[in-house]
């Protein structure tokens, strides 16, 4: 190990003063030391070297760590979403694109099967999937479907027919009802808008609007982007006429400046809390009447633009995600908010909390535990607060161990002290390079009773020679499981 260290980290003019002084002390200490002292001294010095070079201790896997390959082959697979049935936590459902593909488990992730009846009909493409369980244990799938996109990044320019759709499963995700129910749909005609990035929220609380379903999304036109919203009070059978909930309009381009990235959560009293990004802020609003009306939206956290360039990734964003600990906040719940931006020079993941229904928010806490300003990017975070334990869980890609800032692993971060600090765990330790492929716009995570499920996209290695008939895209969807229920309070 000493010779390996010398090869990779020579002590010379580039070494820090602390490293040089430590080496001198280490050599002097060993001259008259016994064997036991030498072993202890070497271990301590190895830790000192790692810290002196800006590296913390190696991350450990979370308790009960398990990785599952959900796609058996490579393809254009990305943007996964995961949900746990609160009526029966053994039931877990995962959706991913392209197409609205579903896999499900009836035994807490022990075995996974493909669902039937989920692929959309009558449209060429579908995606931007999300899943949720309602208070009855019914599973719901939301997605967009269209024939082709509009002008590059300007989806409302020359868009073809498109819409937002929802499907329901009455047996935990095994089979899905047809046809899909349109939340909003546009037939083919000149000048139609484009509906993008919907996200589904279910009220599975015991509040006055229990059972309600909510969908928010970005509505692109030729001149602007706004956040639209619709609700269902009859188990997803019908949906209300969409209303605009963004006070300020965004730019018409699917990029910085757009009103985009809807995320929502329901508090224990039935209040719906919603966030998105507008290019300069995390924007927040809420509804106290089951989604009929909303307060004026307002910026709550200034952020660097949510779209940013990361090497070897087709595109990257830091859209906000909101979740809630129903046991906190003086009965109203403790809200958690996460996003990522590059305020520190490289991309980091941040978290803030609110104990007063979103009126005020705590200063941003950096979630990733690598040294600040180390040049490593952490991105595509997603958040889930365990409704049973109150622990906040985040999943994200992490490049802290790659000096070139290209290869990523997957990290699970967890807070048990109301978001003040986060423990980082190495969930997937096989680094991958995205190779400029599209790995989606988001990951996913769900937690219940100490058991955590995370889903993400990975680029798989390509062969040196492209063979005819081989897939043009090389991504897979994987799932990680962690179990803190039997790990003790120290975790």
Regions found by a protein language model. Name each.
Residues 48-56:
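Bacterial Sec-dependent signal peptides at the C-terminal "C-region" and cleavage site
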Residues 55-491:
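Extracellular, repeat-based ectodomains that mediate carbohydrate processing or recognition
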Residues 6, 15, 39, 43-44, ...:
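N-terminal regions of proteins, emphasizing targeting and processing segments when present
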Residues 1-35:
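N-terminal secretory signal peptides that target proteins for export/translocation
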Residues 13-14, 44, 72, 434:
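Generic alpha-helical structural signal
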Residues 29, 36-48:
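Bacterial N-terminal signal peptides
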């Amino acid at each position: 190990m000493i010779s390996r260290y010398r090869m990779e980290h020579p002590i010379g003019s580039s070494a820090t003063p602390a490293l040089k002084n430590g080496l001198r002390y280490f050599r002097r200490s060993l001259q008259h030391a016994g064997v036991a002292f030498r072993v202890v001294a070497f271990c301590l010095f190895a830790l000192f070297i790692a810290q002196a070079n800006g590296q913390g201790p190696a991350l450990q896997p979370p308790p009960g760590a398990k990785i599952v390959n959900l796609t058996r082959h490579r393809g254009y697979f990305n943007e996964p979403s995961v949900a746990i049935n609160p009526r029966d936590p053994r039931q877990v459902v995962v959706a991913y694109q392209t197409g609205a593909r579903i896999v499900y488990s009836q035994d807490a992730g022990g075995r996974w099967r493909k669902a039937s009846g989920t692929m959309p009909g009558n449209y060429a493409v579908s995606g931007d999937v999300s899943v949720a369980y309602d208070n009855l244990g019914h599973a719901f799938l939301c997605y967009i479907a269209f024939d082709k996109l509009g002008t590059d990044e300007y989806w409302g320019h020359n868009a073809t027919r498109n819409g937002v759709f929802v499907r329901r499963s009455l047996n935990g995700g095994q089979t899905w009802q047809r046809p899909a129910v349109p939340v909003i749909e546009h037939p083919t005609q000149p000048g139609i808008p484009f509906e993008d990035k919907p996200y589904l929220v279910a009220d599975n609380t015991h509040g006055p609007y229990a059972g309600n379903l909510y969908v928010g999304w970005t509505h692109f036109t030729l001149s602007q982007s706004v956040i639209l919203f619709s609700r269902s009070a009859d188990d997803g059978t019908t949906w209300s006429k969409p209303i605009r909930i963004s006070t300020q309009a965004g730019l018409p381009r699917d990029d910085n400046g757009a009103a985009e990235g809807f995320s929502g959560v329901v508090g224990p009293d039935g209040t719906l809390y919603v966030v998105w990004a507008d290019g300069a802020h995390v924007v927040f609003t809420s509804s106290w009447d089951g989604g009929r009306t909303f307060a004026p939206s307002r910026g709550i956290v200034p952020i660097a633009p949510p779209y940013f360039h990361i090497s070897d990734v087709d595109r990257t964003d830091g859209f906000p995600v909101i979740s809630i600990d129903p046991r906190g906040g003086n009965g109203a719940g403790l809200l958690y908010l996460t996003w990522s931006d590059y305020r520190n020079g490289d991309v980091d993941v941040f978290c803030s909390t609110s104990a007063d229904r979103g009126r005020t928010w705590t200063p941003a806490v950096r979630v990733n535990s690598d040294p600040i300003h180390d040049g490593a990017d952490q991105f595509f975070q997603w958040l889930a607060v365990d409704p049973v334990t109150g622990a906040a869980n985040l999943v994200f890609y992490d490049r802290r161990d790659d000096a070139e800032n290209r290869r990523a692993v997957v990290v699970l971060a967890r807070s048990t002290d109301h978001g003040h600090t986060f423990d980082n765990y190495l969930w997937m330790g096989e680094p991958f390079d995205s190779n400029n492929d599209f790995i989606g716009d988001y990951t996913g995570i769900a937690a219940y009773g100490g058991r955590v499920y995370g889903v993400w996209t990975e680029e798989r290695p390509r062969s040196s020679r492209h063979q005819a008939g081989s897939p043009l895209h090389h991504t897979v969807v994987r799932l990680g499981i962690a179990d803190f229920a039997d790990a003790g309070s120290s975790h």
